[in-house]
Amino acid sequence: MPAAADDVAATDGRPVNSGAPESAPPGPPEATGLRLLAVHAHPDDESSKGAATMARYVRSGVDVMVATLTGGERGDILNKAMERPEVRANLPRIRREEMDKAREILGVQQRFLGFTDSGLPEGDPLPPLPDGCFALEKLEDAAEPLVALVREFRPHVLLTYDENGGYPHPDHVKTHEVAIEAFEAAADPDRYPGSGRPWQPLKLYYFATFHKARITALHEELVRRGLESPYAEWLANWEDEPEGRKALEITTQVPCGAFFSIRDQALLAHATQIDPESSWFACPPDAQQAAWPTEDYHLARSLVDTELPEDDLFAGIRERVSR
């Protein structure tokens, strides 16, 4: 699990759509005409945030695209079994290969947008970011490839991180800025000329993955089953909101428990980043379905009418597309 968690406030502390686990739909899906674009900083982010949601929508006929802003070139190797000289020497290539495997597992399309990983600076004071990295790009230069992709793919819904990046990685914060710029600019023919025909996405969501209500529910389910929980220390040390900063409200909970196993397969495809013995997999999928069978989001922008809370990222959009 990441070092820091999303700052969110659940609507009532439990998923809106808890109850019997849903089943994965059988057979090939019928095309819906709906399109979803998830905007991420690095390969592996797509598998740790919103992966089960994407798998569910793909298998219900939605076209799903992942935009990956960087290649993860400066990432650490977090799986000891992969800590080998030849892996370190070829990390950019290997991370692309891992992304290809995860893409196939999830069933999504995927596009690298060509920027260089900034790395996660450590120290006090923090060292300067490396020249040429994504986080130091001018906003217009960083946003242009995403604007072009939005105009090409023409998504109805965008997913990305909140203004704090979900956790304080400079590439995640920059990804938020770039996604906001693309959402606001892609429909304006006077902005980013030469980057395709204008297109306006209708909804923008922030991931709300690692929030206290969910982690507490997973912890309690493991304890109830007599299993060891890796979350006790995390919860004990949980830092509440800084004074003056409003928690991110959960507005939308997508039931996708039947796809948690697919999410986990996609995570494992990122072998340099995910240790199969790590706390990522401490809570079995069936326990997760029982405790918290949704993936959660905050609706940040909407150009369509929708009633909150939602259980569908396309609420308010399906009717338009089906006409």
What is the meaning of each model-derived region?
Residues 142, 146-164, 172-175:
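Proline-aspartate-enriched helix->loop->beta-strand connector
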Residues 1-32, 188-323:
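C-terminal accessory domains and tails appended to enzymatic cores
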